[in-house]
Design a protein with these regions (language model features):
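Serine/proline-rich low-complexity intrinsically disordered segments, especially terminal tails, linkers
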Residues: 11, 34, 271, 297-298, ...
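Conserved beta-strand/loop scaffold segments within soluble protein domains that form the structured core
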Residues: 134, 138, 143-409, 420-424
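A local structural micro-motif
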Residues: 70, 411-413
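Small-residue helix-packing motif on alpha-helices
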Residues: 62, 414-415
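Catalytic-core signal marking the mid-to-C-terminal active-site face
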Residues: 49, 415-420
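Short, low-to-moderate order helix/coil transition modules at the start of elongated helical scaffolds
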Residues: 2-243, 249-250, 254
Length: 424
């Protein structure tokens, strides 16, 4: 982490090139009295007072509640102690580094592409142009005091890692898909890459609001590549009758990753998320969905967790209005010494009549040393619904393995075929 919203540098007294800290050290610093007392004197406090209010409220909440623990339902099975034991390399700011700009210069040869790096937004040339119904970006360079002050009010404190991510984010960004764009960004999807600017074990954070305005149809291809520590807090606002499709791929390149995704679904909106993940030394991927009336939500995950990697997930959907549809279908495959967990919760209020929900989580262990947990939680307060769930953990079917080997298929290839069949 190089900067926070209201601090020019973080842990500057520990910013030696060869010194390491952990996540608790960073949280302790940004919630210290000295840090909070300096907020009124910061640059952005005068320009965007609402930012200061939101940021300070987040810090005070973080100071009171601290980092998430296993006592919280969503982290009951997560090996959260492994996350807190990760060493993070202290580093001075690279915010204006030519090397960083050069690292992402490949965008010049792409179209409909965005890179998010430590709250910086880099775009391909076509998205950087001002034209009717093009994407609008509000960041520390392209500012609009009134609009940004309204958007930042959406960043409310939640019982997860989003508070930490926001506290360590240099600047919260907003990416707007205007209603007049219709299905322009659906026919030609937008690629959103989450990247580290270094392969060193530093930590970089992004807090981003994606606003899909009414009647707009948007397709995002999200590519998360973790070469170092990365924390992402992304909020997706689906306005009335908006449609959003996300295809997210997360690959391990030696780092670790926390990704909190919050979806605010207005009436008549449609959300589809398809994702894959390999896990990492620690990965936490959470989805929080707040559904208004007549919404449709599909969350489909197919994850192959690599040897020794950690992958933990919490999916929460809240429905307080009628006629909502939901399908959560997540399958995990764990290789040797992998550790995974899934906790899914439906919270259906008394006014959410005709809710139609299906929650499935299937897990396949490829080795006896794999650890996999799964738990569905249904909190239903109305009888006028249709809801079903199924969560399982199983081993490779030896009968299927024997059959394939009897046909001349070697054991490794047979295992790969069974995994591919499981994840299809």
């Amino acid at each position: 982490v190089y900067k926070t919203l209201f601090g020019q540098s973080l842990l500057t007294h520990l910013a030696n090139a060869d010194e390491f800290n952990n996540l608790e050290d960073y949280v302790e610093h940004v919630t210290s009295n000295n840090f909070i007392d300096e907020l009124p004197h910061s640059y952005w406090a005068n320009i965007l007072p609402q930012f200061k209010q939101s940021f300070e409220a987040n810090l005070l909440s973080l100071k009171e509640e601290g980092l998430p623990t296993k006592r919280s339902e969503q982290f009951n099975f997560a090996n959260i102690h492994k996350l807190y034991a990760i060493d993070i390399l202290s580093s001075e700011s690279d915010h204006d580094s030519y090397d960083v700009i050069e690292r992402f210069s490949y965008l010049n040869g792409l179209s409909k592409a965005i890179v998010l790096n430590d709250s910086r937004v880099f775009t391909s040339n076509d998205l950087g142009k001002r034209s009717p119904f093009n994407i609008q970006i509000l960041d520390s360079v392209n500012t609009n005091k009134h609009r940004q002050s309204e958007y930042v009010k959406l960043l409310k404190q939640q019982d997860n890692f989003s508070k930490v991510t926001y506290a360590l984010t240099p600047f919260p960004n907003v990416i707007i898909f205007p209603n007049g764009s219709n299905d322009t960004f659906n026919k030609k999807p937008v690629t959103v890459q989450y990247r580290n600017s270094s392969d060193e074990p530093i930590l970089q954070c992004n807090t981003t609001i994606f606003d899909v305005q009414y009647n707009a149809k948007v397709h995002l291809k999200e590519d998360v590549k973790t070469t170092a520590g990365q924390m992402n807090y992304s909020m997706y606002v689906l306005r009335e009758n908006a449609e959003l499709t996300i295809e997210r791929t997360t690959n391990d390149y030696g780092g670790w990753n926390i990704f909190d995704s919050v979806f605010i679904c207005h009436p008549g909106s449609k959300l589809t998320v398809k994702f894959t993940n390999t896990g990492s030394q620690y990965t936490q991927e959470n989805f929080y969905i707040d559904s208004s009336s007549k919404t449709s939500v599909d969350i489909i995950g197919r994850n192959e967790i690599y040897k020794g990697n950690q992958y933990h997930q919490y999916v929460y959907q809240k429905s307080n209005d009628p006629d909502n549809y939901s399908c959560i279908d997540i399958r995990n495959v764990g290789k040797e010494y992998a550790s995974t967990s899934f906790i899914g919760r439906y919270d259906v209020g008394p006014l959410s009549t005709d809710f139609d929900g299906t929650m499935n989580n299937q897990n396949l262990m490829l080795d006896k040393n794999v650890t996999m947990h799964t738990r569905p939680v249904l909190d239903i307060h109305t009888k006028e619904i249709k809801c079903q769930h199924g969560c399982t953990v199983s081993n490779v079917n030896e009968d299927h393995m024997y059959y394939l080997q009897s046909k001349g298929v070697d054991r490794i290839t047979a295992s790969e075929m069974l995994v591919e069949s499981f994840l299809c």
